[in-house]
Amino acid sequence: MRASQSPMLDPRARQLLRTLIARYIRDGEPVGSKTLAQHAGLDVSPATIRNILADLEDVGLLSSPHTSAGRVPTAHGYRVFVDSLVQMQPPGEEEVRRLRAELASGNGTQSLLGSASQMLSAMSHFVGVVSAPRREQFAFRHIDFVALDARRVLAILVFADNEVQNRVIEPRRAYEPAELERVANYLNAQFAGRALADIRACLLRELRMAKSEMEQLLAHSVELASEALVPADADDMVMAGQTRLMGVQDLSDLDRLRELFEAFASKREILQLLERTIQAPGVRIFIGEETGMVSLEDVSLVTAPYAANGQVLGVLGVIGPKRMAYDRLIPLVQTAADVLGAAMQSPGAR
């Protein structure tokens, strides 16, 4: 539920809801009217506070556990809190310094993604997750072809971020080593520094306009490049800190925890969720059932896209219990996205 769908609350109700949720996030215990009377900073009687809490419960922002006289926020209550009540606590200078040091430019892309997920986990005490950029967004630096036998060719592809991929391709006909060398030299001379997604289309355009003496080389280049430069299936997401959730009180239901870890293992559902946020600017938050996935109904995700050279590359974030310190984690995730994007923008990463 977004802020526009939230019930209208008067200033006293907003202050009580803010105080109650902040106390519950901090202590993990239902919050009663006596505690609120002491900490909400309102000059009202306990009876008035109880009436306001009852109203907040009636509109679905709070619930009352059977074993306690206090109240706890619902997913709807958390949504109102993060949309309009939370008071952000940006990361301190030391945290920002740690992020920049760990995500220093010059590291390869996979190393940066791993470091980012580990730092998010360490700084949030929950799960850090980073979706990987698609390889077709990256420029290639160099390509070589090696004949393995009469029908198979090894393509050795070096990307601008220093990642190397070896791909075995099976052209329609056998190629002599000299032919493979000519094609590699042509591709390196004409297309080094170009994104994979652009190269095949350029080759096809050039083939249509080519003079007869170039047609054979271009035709060979199109055939080999069509297979060698197709983005390979990759590890599309890097996660760290999954086991941290095993000690979280709010996630103590073993059956639900098993479903959550199955989602971590398959990655598909979490990747789908991250894909929904990749074109949305700034931080997006999914709370419980807002994820649309049963396995994630007990957790929240705080996500933000990261970009380099004006292009969104992927999404990073934190997965944790709904009772998380949103005031700290929302700005932390945004800062991590900014730092990772800056590192990816450096020549060593892209």
From Swiss-Prot:
This is Heat-inducible transcription repressor HrcA. Keywords: Repressor, Stress response, Transcription, Transcription regulation. One of its GO terms (molecular function) is DNA binding. It comes from Xanthomonas axonopodis pv. citri (strain 306). NCBIfam families: hrcA. The keyword Ribonucleoprotein does not apply. Belongs to the HrcA family. InterPro entries: GAF-like_dom_sf, HrcA, HrcA_C, WH-like_DNA-bd_sf, WH_DNA-bd_sf, WHTH_HrcA_DNA-bd, WHTH_transcript_rep_HrcA_IDD. One of its GO terms (biological process) is negative regulation of DNA-templated transcription. Negative regulator of class I heat shock genes (grpE-dnaK-dnaJ and groELS operons). Prevents heat-shock induction of these operons. It holds the Pfam family HrcA_DNA-bdg.
